[in-house]
């Protein structure tokens, strides 16, 4: 596993400590299920309202938003509640409720659809959304809450990667790259950040305002749990740390090594003010420093940072993997090396030569680059990798550094 937390029996963590958070009627499970299906319900309402043959540019745009969100939600659910797509197409997945069967499902319930049926719906929705976004002249402007055609390409690239449609995944990733901003530079990545949706590498985000309830609640928000230099759950001991083994595999020449404290609680990416705050809070070794506080203010209690849902860096990694697995491992390796050299580590050399070796090299870069962004677990499922809980920094009856 890539993210580590201390054993903290505090507040809502109690259920997790006693392994009671696995049942259907407990909050962690309910939150995921209800959030996805509530969004699907809303999306179904929009889809049922707008004529799919409309010539109105604004309506095309709004229909594309609903179809994209519905596809995103079902993609999350499909990955969470069944094994990965390939080899499991006929297995039961989640109930598939669309605008076409919503009334029937409300009255009589809805049986689980197969994995294939759910993915067919996901791809159908994304294909329609892409066509609509390509056909409309309405754009989101600078508001990255909304889905642009580049984000739709990115979503479809994710799904195609999971379905092992390598050529299509590469094509969509390249289209997303072509219409998006550039990745963070080494200089930009060399300081705590990842708080502003306006950053050029961000494609899609949850945009937060200071007046939002999630902020005024105080600590019930993303920065509270992920931030090490602001006020929140982390500052009372719920630190988010990196697996020591993964950290040790990051070269010293890679600017991302400073996204976490080392064994001596040092990071080259911190300035004097940030070092003082980390010391004051007592941040343990390997604590994350990737996410800075809102507006860069130390001990910030206004946790109004935006939340990244998609960055262009991911598209480069999808492109490299899809090229390699699609029959061109040397091209995939070159794409990966150029991305890392240009933006993260000028000394990096991708020595992988086979398709699967390049795929593993990409996975390693995904584990580092996208750490804390909600994709690591899905990668483990997609690639059929086990979850290795050794080197997790906690005291265990058996050796942990094997």
Give residue ranges: language-model regions.
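Short hydrophobic "helix-edge" motifs at membrane interfaces and signal-peptide entry regions
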Residues: 244-245
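Short, cationic low-complexity segments
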Residues: 225-238
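Acidic/polar-rich alpha-helix caps and helix-coil junctions
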Residues: 1, 5, 25-221, 237, ...
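Cytochrome P450
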Residues: 6-19
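Acidic/histidine-rich, surface-exposed loop or edge segments in extracytoplasmic proteins
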Residues: 17-27
């Amino acid at each position: 596993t890539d993210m580590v937390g201390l054993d903290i029996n505090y507040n809502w963590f109690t259920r997790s400590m006693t392994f009671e958070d696995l049942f259907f009627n407990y909050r962690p499970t309910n939150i995921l299920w209800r959030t996805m299906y509530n969004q699907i319900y809303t999306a179904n309402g929009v889809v049922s309202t707008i004529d799919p043959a409309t010539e109105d540019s604004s309506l095309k745009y709004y229909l594309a938003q609903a179809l994209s969100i519905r596809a995103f939600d079902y993609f999350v659910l499909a990955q969470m509640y069944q094994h990965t797509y390939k080899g499991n197409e006929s297995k039961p997945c989640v109930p598939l409720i669309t605008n076409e069967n919503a009334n029937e499902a409300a009255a009589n319930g809805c049986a689980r659809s197969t994995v294939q049926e759910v993915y067919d719906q996901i791809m159908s929705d994304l294909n329609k959304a892409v066509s609509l976004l390509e056909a409309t002249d309405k754009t989101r402007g600078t508001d990255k809450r909304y889905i642009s055609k580049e984000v739709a390409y990115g979503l479809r690239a994710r799904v195609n990667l999971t379905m092992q449609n390598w050529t299509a995944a590469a094509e969509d990733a390249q289209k997303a790259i072509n219409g998006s901003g550039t990745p963070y530079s080494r200089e930009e990545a060399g300081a705590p950040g990842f708080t502003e949706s306006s950053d050029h590498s961000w494609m899609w985000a949850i945009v937060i305002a200071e007046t939002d309830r999630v902020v005024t609640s105080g600590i019930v928000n993303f920065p509270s749990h992920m931030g090490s230099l602001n006020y929140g759950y982390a500052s009372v001991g719920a630190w988010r740390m990196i697996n020591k083994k993964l950290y040790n595999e990051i070269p010293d020449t890679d600017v991302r090594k400073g996204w976490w404290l080392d064994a001596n609680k040092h990071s080259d990416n911190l300035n004097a003010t940030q070092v003082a705050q980390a010391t004051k809070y007592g941040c343990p070794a390997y604590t994350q420093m990737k996410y800075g506080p809102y507006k860069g203010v130390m001990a910030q209690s206004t946790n109004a940072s935006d939340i990244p849902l998609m960055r262009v860096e991911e598209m480069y990694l999808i492109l490299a993997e899809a090229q390699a697995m699609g029959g061109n491992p040397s091209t995939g390796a070159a794409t990966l090396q150029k991305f890392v050299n240009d933006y993260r580590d000028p000394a990096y050399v991708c020595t992988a030569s086979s398709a699967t070796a390049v795929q593993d090299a990409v996975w390693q870069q995904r584990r580092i680059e996208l750490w804390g962004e909600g994709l690591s677990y899905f990668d483990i499922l997609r690639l059929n990798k086990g979850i290795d809980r050794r080197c997790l920094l906690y005291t265990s009856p058996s050796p942990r550094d094997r």
